[in-house]
Structure formats: C-alpha cells, structure tokens
Amino acid sequence: MMKISYHLSLLCSFIYLAGCQKNGEIIIMGNGLVIEDLVIGEGSEAQDYNKVVVNYTGTLEDGSIFDSSLKPGGTPFTFTLGVGSVIKGWDLGVKGMKVGGKRKLTIPADLGYGNNGAGNVIPPNATLTFEVELLEVEVY
C-alpha cells in the first residue's frame, strides 16, 4: 500500500510540475529526454498532427554544431508533429511548445539516430542537444 501511495504522490507531483511552465524549467522524462524551457511562448500550442515551423541548432556532446537552420543560407524547418517524420526526441520535445517559445532538448541516442548514427556527421549512440524555437503552428 505504501508503494502505491508513493507512486501516486510521484505522479501527482509530475502532473503539477508539468502545468507550471516557466523559463529555465527542466523536465527529465522517463525515456531520458531532457526538456528545458528557455523562453515560454505565448502563441498557439504545438500538438500532434499540427504542421510546425522551427529554427534549430543541433550540437554533439563535445559542443560542435552539426546542423542549424540559422547558418548562412539556412531556412526554418517545417514538419508535421507526431507522425514520425523526424527523430522521436523532436516529436516528444516540440509537443506542447507555444509559438515564440524556445527549448533546449537533450536527446538520448535511442530517441535520436540510435546505433547507426547519421552519415559522417552524427556518430553511433550519440546524445544530441538541440535548441529549438517554435515559429509557427498550423492546425489541420
């Protein structure tokens, strides 16, 4: 009975904290995804099946940038949330953001490119960090 009470208390705490978004808040998900709200947006909220437009910068554990929409000649990236068109860490980490918001996502390998990595840019089993800014949400 005490074990159930503990788990219920933990669940209630998580639900409470999930509703208290503020700048600098860090959430560590059970799957290892770390979400840090850098700026809380005030626009539309991104949900599954919405088309979203983001600016992003991706870095490896050593801090080296492997990709960015902000590089010279870069453009914002558009994708449909929650349909698997991007790595799982993005689908999970962008969901719930509001337009104008910025998040730092630290994505473990199994929610990124896993054992295979990606070309010669992302090594196998790499933890990735993305700073993502939500620019637009289009509801279908």
Which residues make up each language-model segment?
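Cross-family detector of peptidyl-prolyl cis-trans isomerase
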Residues: K3-S9, Y16-Y140
